[in-house]
Amino acid sequence: MKRNMAVLFGFLFFSLLFAAAGYAAEMASKCTLCGMNIAGNENTAYEIVYMGGTEETYCCPHCGLYMHTTKKDSVKSSRARDFISGEWMDPAQMTFVFKSSAVPACSPSWIGFGDKTAAKKFQKGFGGTIYSYEEALTERAKMPKGMEMKGM
């Protein structure tokens, strides 16, 4: 009887351990601001490393720029993905298109481009307003944290 109880408790312990590990892995693959999955949004990802060494991944510049503006004094470094190539870049060297008809992640969309010419071509097809990095930070700081929810 004691052996059966020990086996049962051992099974329950390991089941809870595996469930917790699975939950942690799932949460690590979600945007830390809005909770959107990072998988599927790889070309819009935005990462910030804070002074204490904590690294946060956001699904897109909508979330990343917001956190960058609200925690600017604690930001050590950041990087964002170029929407076209998917390459990591310094956001300060990027051009951003705001509120285009294309919404790959959050809405209103902020989409980063490593090349201003590519941003202009994208804008011709999908609309939106072009901002430099500094302009994007200034504009994003004026906006609320969350997303626009159509029809709500």
Regions found by a protein language model. Give the residues of each.
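C-terminal partner/receptor-binding element of secreted or periplasmic proteins
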Residues: 114-152
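Short, non-ligating residues that shape and space the ligands of small metal-coordination modules
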Residues: 40-41
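Bacterial N-terminal signal peptides
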Residues: 9-19
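Bacterial N-terminal signal peptides that target proteins for export
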Residues: 1-9
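Beta-edge loop/turn motif
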Residues: 54-64
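Short cysteine-rich clusters marking metal-coordination/redox-active sites
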Residues: 31-34
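Residues immediately within or flanking Cys/His clusters that coordinate Zn2+
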Residues: 28
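Cys/His-rich metal-chelating microdomains
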Residues: 37, 66
